[in-house]
């Protein structure tokens, strides 16, 4: 399995999000997204969700990506604009860079360059820690966000199910003899059968009837001894106690079933297993990011998928996307091209 292209950069493959674009906005929109003509949305809630995921699943990556600023932070959009202009300045002389940055954020009518420079120097001094941290390329985390992360982690650690599901990544080998134990202790595990694996942010490139697909699972546990795989997905929400609404609004069942398809392809094509011999579990670990910062774990059952017709919806969508990909016809639906131009409603 070739995953040399980072997940979010590979636009040649169909993700669960791509299926959502196709179902909600049609083939032309999907094609434009895949071609990079429509940028991805970036909202504060999405950015916060990414931060929480990384903090819980990739703590080392979190340290390399985020930084708590100990000094004063910008108090207005004008100060933030001043900082961004200053760190992106191509001016060689620092005084000119300061003046230009200040003028980009504030009106300097009636003020001399010397007066502007004095104001800019004072502001740069007040924000020096923030400027240095921003120049480092790391994302700045607020005091509140750090407290939020701590609250969520503590609540997960004290939750009797979430704490069992969200463990650090590991690989356990089968050891049938003392020499096998010695191999594990010395790290010479080549040739030893694997009993269990736990992966976070697990990237799978797979195929559906020749259509190139991709999935990025929050957490995947593979139990080779008992032939059971467990998918765990983290969700941040403000609807923790009526999470059913979020399940329907964001079509989380579709996402989880798509992950199941990816895992079963992976077991068969990459691990030499027959997925029909395997059982499965799916869990959603939902975290409230406001008020009490509670955590709830939801066990997704087989009946949930079938009651929602999830299987049919995904397979129908993939078949349609496959058809559009093969024919190159993206302006209208497959039904439009196959008939007289009229289309039916799924009422």
What are these regions (language model features)?
Residues 56-61, 221, 236-239, 264-268:
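Hydrophobic/aromatic-lined pockets within catalytic cores
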Residues 51, 218, 254-262:
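Short amphipathic alpha-helical face segments that pack within enzyme cores
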Residues 1-214:
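Metal-dependent nuclease catalytic cores that hydrolyze phosphodiester bonds in DNA/RNA
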Residues 204-253:
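Non-catalytic protein-protein interaction segments used by genome-maintenance enzymes to assemble
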Residues 29-33, 235-240, 291-294:
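Short acidic (Asp/Glu) and glycine-rich catalytic loops that position anionic groups and cofactors
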Residues 91-106, 153, 245-253, 261-347:
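Metal-dependent nuclease catalytic regions and adjoining charged, substrate-binding loops involved
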């Amino acid at each position: 399995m070739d995953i040399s292209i980072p997940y979010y950069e590979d636009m040649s493959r169909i993700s669960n999000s791509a299926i959502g674009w196709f179902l909600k906005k049609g083939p032309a929109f999907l094609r434009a997204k895949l071609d990079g003509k429509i940028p991805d949305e970036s909202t504060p809630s999405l950015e916060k969700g990414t931060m929480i995921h990384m903090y819980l699943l990739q703590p080392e990556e979190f340290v390399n990506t985020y930084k708590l600023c100990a000094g004063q932070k910008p108090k207005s959009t004008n100060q933030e604009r001043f900082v961004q202009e200053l760190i992106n300045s191509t001016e060689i002389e620092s005084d000119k860079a300061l003046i230009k940055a200040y003028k980009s954020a504030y009106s300097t009518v009636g003020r001399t360059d010397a007066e502007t420079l004095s104001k800019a120097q004072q502001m740069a001094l007040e924000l020096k820690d923030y400027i240095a941290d921003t120049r480092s390329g790391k994302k700045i985390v607020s005091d509140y966000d750090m407290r939020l992360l701590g609250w969520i982690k503590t609540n997960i650690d004290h939750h009797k199910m979430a704490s069992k599901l969200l463990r650090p990544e590991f690989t356990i080998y089968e050891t049938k003899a003392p020499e096998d134990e010695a191999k594990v202790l010395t790290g010479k595990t080549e040739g030893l059968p694997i009993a269990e694996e736990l992966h976070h942010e697990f990237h799978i490139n797979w195929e559906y009837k020749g259509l190139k697909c991709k999935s990025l699972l929050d957490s995947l546990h593979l139990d080779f001894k008992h032939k059971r795989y467990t998918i765990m997905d983290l969700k941040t929400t403000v609807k923790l106690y009526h999470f059913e609404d979020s399940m329907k609004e964001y079509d989380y069942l579709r996402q989880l079933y798509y992950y199941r398809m990816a895992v079963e392809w992976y077991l068969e094509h990459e691990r030499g297993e027959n997925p029909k011999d395997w059982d499965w579990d799916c869990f959603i670990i939902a975290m409230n990011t406001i008020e009490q910062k509670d955590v709830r774990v939801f066990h997704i059952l087989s009946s949930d998928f079938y009651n929602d017709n999830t299987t049919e919806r995904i397979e129908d969508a993939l078949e349609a996307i496959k058809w559009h990909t093969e024919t190159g016809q993206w302006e209208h639906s497959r039904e439009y091209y196959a008939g007289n131009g009229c289309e039916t409603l799924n009422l």
